[in-house]
Amino acid sequence: MAEDPEAVLQLPAAPAAAAGESLLELSPETAIPEPPSSVAVSPGTEEPPGDTKKKIDILLKAVGDTPIMKTKKWAVERTRTVQALIDFIRKFLRLLASEQLFIYVNQSFAPSPDQEVGTLYECFGSDGKLVLHYCKSQAWG
């Protein structure tokens, strides 16, 4: 199956905003152009000098009997919280209100719902992306 390179998904913004007022834009990897290889990069970092990357790449992997998302790599704003990701995944997978969803970083721990994705990326990101596992039942610590 071919995926639509222009696919963009939207979900409600930060929890403080009223429902429907603003939308979070998540786009698959194919909708984000890669920077040219001629861009100067500081030693030890993956970001151009003097410019902070506004979105980070997140790789979402299903665990257990949880449905698999066809698009696994997403670009998300650094300021988004883990709870916003949980809400997005629940909506994307069309989970019932009674079904739980757990998020794990690197198959080891569940981050706090108010934790910002950018902070997780800085601490646990590797190869230019943050790997998050999602499941409907508790899997790790």
From Swiss-Prot:
GO BP, one annotated term: piecemeal microautophagy of the nucleus
Annotated localization: Cytoplasm; Preautophagosomal structure membrane
The keyword Membrane belongs to this UniProt entry's keyword annotation: yes
Upregulation: Activated in retinal ganglion cells (RGCs) following optic nerve transection. Induced under starvation conditions, through the action of the Foxo1 and Foxo3 transcription factors.
Chief location category: cytoplasm
Region feature Disordered, mapped onto this chain: 24-54
A single GO molecular function term of this UniProt record: protein tag activity
Keywords: Acetylation, Autophagy, Cytoplasm, Immunity, Innate immunity, Isopeptide bond, Membrane, Ubl conjugation pathway
Matching Pfam families: APG12
GO cellular component terms attached to this protein's record: Atg12-Atg5-Atg16 complex; autophagosome; autophagosome membrane; membrane; phagophore assembly site membrane; protein-containing complex; transferase complex
CDD domains: Ubl_ATG12
PTM summary: Acetylated by EP300.
Top-rank taxon: Eukaryota
Covalent cross-link Glycyl lysine isopeptide (Gly-Lys) (interchain with K-? in acceptor protein) as placed by the record, residue numbers: G141
InterPro entries given in the database record: Atg12, Ubiquitin-like_domsf
Topology versus the membrane: Peripheral membrane protein
Record text on subunit structure and interactions: Forms a conjugate with ATG5. Part of the minor complex composed of 4 sets of ATG12-ATG5 and ATG16L1 (400 kDa); this complex interacts with ATG3 leading to disruption of ATG7 interaction and promotion of ATG8-like proteins lipidation. Forms an 800-kDa complex composed of ATG12-ATG5 and ATG16L2. Interacts with DHX58/RIG-1, IFIH1/MDA5 and MAVS/IPS-1 in monomeric form as well as in ATG12-ATG5 conjugate. The interaction with MAVS is further enhanced upon vesicular stomatitis virus (VSV) infection.
Role description: Ubiquitin-like protein involved in autophagy vesicles formation. Conjugation with ATG5 through a ubiquitin-like conjugating system involving also ATG7 as an E1-like activating enzyme and ATG10 as an E2-like conjugating enzyme, is essential for its function. The ATG12-ATG5 conjugate acts as an E3-like enzyme which is required for lipidation of ATG8 family proteins and their association to the vesicle membranes. The ATG12-ATG5 conjugate also negatively regulates the innate antiviral immune response by blocking the type I IFN production pathway through direct association with RARRES3 and MAVS.
Family: Belongs to the ATG12 family.
Free-text comment about domains: Shares weak sequence similarity with ubiquitin family, but contains an 'ubiquitin superfold' and the C-terminal Gly is required for isopeptide linkage.
Name of the featured protein: Ubiquitin-like protein ATG12
Organism lineage string: Eukaryota, Metazoa, Chordata, Craniata, Vertebrata
